[in-house]
């Protein structure tokens, strides 16, 4: 048997499926495309997650786009994290061009231009349906992980949530959270100490600094109402029955990784808490693509990485698949990389000694093969080509295959501002979520309580007992005057906020 026939038999047997699948492309050997060697991705294994990696300009985004189209055609909803802004073209039909026609001819497939049902979402100032979550929904554990708090600080946050629950104080946004922090440190300190124990002002100040740091990355836009219902991500187009493609526009978050990580972890936790258990179903209920995944992992604390790892392990039983897109597999922590069933590896570039080391490590992550020199091939792959292995329907890794990938059917480019406006005008989610709600919550309730208590406190306050001590300072003299004290408190609070903001900015990781 010739090497080519042996290769063809290996690929056809390794990628055979009984159930439904997506066609990723056609296998290649020695630059030849085998039109009868389909590279198939079984739908039932999509909840085992995946990785799409490769250097800039090698075709990662187009691969992501093609897989998204295939899922939508199968009626499976998709959520895309669009960091670069080049995925919105899914909403418009693609264009023919000579290179595209030549690729389709080599692969033995027909190109059909098509658009897909798209909803644009945002957690920042980008245009789209706004996603929000309340601080209460976020919860003390997740909030503590994001803020990178120690055990003592986590305990204070948990106590703060308990106090708000016990006293009917809604925690909707960060303004509420900061107000409660100030309350338990100042006016409410005695009440807190009696019910929950003494809280150190140094601890609450540290927590406040970290909240301010998060705010400076734009988190105030994310926390609040109306809360996003993750079940809205499961929609299909009522006319075509295609799965809705929800594109999260994150173009302005590239330099704000903490907010990106906050949003991602919150979303995954909410999906896990909301979706019912389905086990290993014939097809996923939702597939999530996280582009530029290194933004989550680069500066993440160990506690945050552990939280992400746990959610990735558990969420597959909810029928949810998660695919990370990044430049090299080494961007993804080993504990998470080991859980990713599908691996699509585009070309890597070897410019430095570190690059060569990364390529060697990447080659070791793939199944051994008699048909390729994996390490060499990783640097020789053309644009729109990739090394692929997926999980078979039996759960085993398929043979490694150099693959010419199918091209997207939708536009390989961005929408114009006018097209974005038209899309948002038709959006069901924009009408539902872009109303800003600011109902009475902890901030207003505690502000009112302070205002009610202040006059009584000044009128009924006992004179301090006389005792021998040093001559009063100018500060203590001023604070004997109620008006001066109130003015001074306000001034000091504003000065402190400004100072803490600077400290938050300079805090190292």
Where do the model's predicted regions map?
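Generic beta-strand/beta-sheet core signal
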Residues: 44, 53-55, 81, 121-123, ...
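Conserved P-loop NTPase motor module
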Residues: 1-16, 28, 130-136, 344, ...
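P-loop NTPase motor domains
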Residues: 69-72, 76-78, 85-310, 380-381, ...
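Helical "lid/switch" subdomain of P-loop NTPase nucleotide-binding domains
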Residues: 83, 300, 304, 328-332, ...
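Basic- and hydrophobic-enriched, low-structure N-terminal and domain-boundary segments
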Residues: 1-55, 62-74, 78-79, 84-109, ...
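Long amphipathic alpha-helical segments used for membrane anchoring, targeting, substrate engagement
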Residues: 459-509
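Conserved ATP-driven motor cores of ASCE-family P-loop NTPases powering translocation/secretion/packaging/pilus
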Residues: 2, 66-68, 91-109, 310-396
């Amino acid at each position: 048997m010739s090497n080519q026939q042996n290769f063809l038999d290996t690929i056809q047997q390794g990628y055979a499926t009984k159930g439904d699948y997506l066609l990723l492309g056609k296998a290649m050997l020695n630059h030849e495309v085998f039109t009868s060697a389909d590279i198939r991705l079984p739908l039932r294994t999509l909840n085992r997650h995946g990785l799409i990696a490769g250097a800039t300009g090698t075709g990662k985004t187009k691969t992501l786009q093609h897989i998204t189209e295939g899922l939508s055609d199968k009626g499976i909803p998709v959520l895309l994290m669009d960091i670069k802004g080049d995925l919105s073209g899914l909403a418009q039909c693609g264009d023919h061009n000579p290179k595209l026609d030549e690729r389709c001819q080599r692969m033995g497939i027909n190109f059909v231009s098509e658009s897909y049902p798209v909803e644009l979402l945002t957690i920042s100032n980008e245009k789209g349906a706004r996603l929000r979550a309340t601080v209460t929904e976020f919860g003390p554990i997740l909030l503590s992980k994001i803020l990178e708090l120690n055990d003592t600080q986590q305990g204070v946050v948990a106590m703060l949530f308990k106090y708000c629950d016990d006293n009917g104080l809604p925690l909707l946004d960060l303004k509420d959270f900061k107000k409660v922090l100030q309350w338990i440190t100042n006016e409410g300190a005695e009440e807190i100490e009696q019910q929950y124990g003494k809280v150190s002002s140094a601890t609450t100040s540290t927590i406040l600094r970290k909240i301010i740091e998060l705010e400076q990355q734009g988190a105030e836009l994310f926390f609040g109402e109306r809360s996003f219902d993750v079940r809205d991500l499961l929609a299909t187009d009522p006319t075509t029955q295609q799965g809705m493609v929800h594109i999260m526009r994150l173009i302005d978050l590239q330099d704000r990784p903490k907010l990106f990580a906050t949003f991602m972890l919150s979303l995954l936790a909410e999906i896990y808490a909301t979706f019912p258990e389905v086990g290993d179903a014939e097809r996923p209920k939702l597939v999530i693509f996280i582009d530029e995944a290194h933004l989550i992992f680069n500066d993440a604390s160990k506690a945050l990485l552990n939280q992400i790892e746990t959610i990735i392990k558990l969420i597959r039983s909810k029928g949810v698949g998660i695919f990370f897109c990044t430049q090299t597999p080494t961007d993804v922590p080993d504990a998470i990389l080991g859980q990713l069933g599908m691996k699509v590896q585009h070309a890597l570039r070897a410019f430095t000694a570190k690059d060569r080391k990364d390529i060697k490590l990447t080659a070791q992550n793939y199944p051994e093969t008699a048909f390729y020199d994996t390490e060499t091939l990783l640097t020789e792959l053309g644009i729109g080509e990739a090394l692929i292995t997926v999980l078979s329907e039996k759960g085993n890794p398929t043979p490694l295959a150099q693959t010419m990938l199918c091209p997207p059917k939708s536009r390989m480019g961005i929408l114009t501002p006018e097209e974005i406006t038209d899309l948002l005008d038709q959006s069901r989610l924009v009408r539902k979520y872009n109303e800003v709600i600011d109902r009475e919550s902890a901030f207003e309730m505690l502000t009112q309580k302070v205002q009610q208590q202040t006059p009584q406190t000044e009128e009924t306050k006992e004179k301090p007992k006389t005792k021998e001590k040093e001559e009063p300072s100018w500060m203590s003299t001023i604070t004997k005057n109620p008006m001066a004290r109130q003015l001074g408190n306000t001034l000091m609070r504003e000065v402190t906020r400004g100072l803490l903001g600077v400290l938050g900015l300079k805090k190292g990781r």
